[in-house]
Regions:
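Homeobox/homeodomain signature
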Residues: 21, 65-66
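Short, contiguous, well-structured surface segments enriched in hydrophobic/aromatic residues
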Residues: 1-54, 76-77, 131-139
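Polyanionic, low-complexity intrinsically disordered segments
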Residues: 40-64, 74-202
């Protein structure tokens, strides 16, 4: 794959050409050149070989949303009619982690929305992000991002609620909003809890 990149024009072709001539190069050189899907494969392979705590169970979900965003896919068009739903299998560990949000999200809502890939993968993305950035050195950046997301979704002058009258009568969108809003409120509460350690079991 590095040779292929080196022989074709793209934004990493110069870097690929440089490393294609190296007899040995470091794994982080490889990471610089790999597309997201190949990075996930490399990450999973590494932790299959070297057993330790990792996020392999959740990275496919993160990859799905990253690719959808990168290609400007319209996720709204398929939130209740998930593409590839027959192949979709929700992550039990993720569902169990969300079960801690009993005050914010009802059991019915958790069961319903975690069965849809888009919602399932968005929850996975939020939990992985907040777990990875929980250390003191990254916490300010994490909290800033989550404050922006909370404002966007949950506050009256945020983008989502600013024109809520457009969607109030659409039960599909309104119920989906309440689920996502509940997830974000739960994360904000837990991030402010000094006893909270992590969202996911890894």
């Amino acid at each position: 794959e590095i040779l292929q990149k080196a022989n074709s024009y793209n934004f990493t072709s110069d870097l690929a050409e440089k490393h294609s001539l190296d007899e040995e190069y470091s794994v982080w050189n490889l990471v610089e050149l790999l597309p997201v899907g190949k990075f996930v494969e490399l990450y999973t392979m590494y932790y299959q070989e070297y057993k330790s705590s990792n996020y392999s169970d959740y990275l496919q979900s993160n990859k799905f949303l990253r690719n959808a965003a990168a290609h400007s896919n319209c996720l709204m068009s398929s939130i209740m009619k998930p593409k590839g739903a027959k192949k979709f299998r929700k992550t039990i560990k993720l569902t169990n982690a969300l079960s801690q949000a009993q005050k914010e999200i009802s059991l019915h809502a958790r069961s319903k929305y975690m069965a849809y890939p888009t919602f399932h993968d968005f929850v996975a993305l939020l939990f992985v992000y907040n777990d990875l950035l929980k250390e003191a050195a990254n916490r300010n950046m994490r909290d800033k991002t989550m404050d922006e997301l909370y404002h966007f979704f949950c506050e009256k002058d945020g983008r989502v609620l600013k024109y809520k009258e457009y969607f109030e009568k659409n039960q599909v969108i309104a119920e989906a909003y309440r689920f996502i809003s509940g997830v974000i409120q739960y994360i904000k509460k837990q991030n402010n809890n000094p006893k909270h350690k992590r969202y996911l079991k890894i």
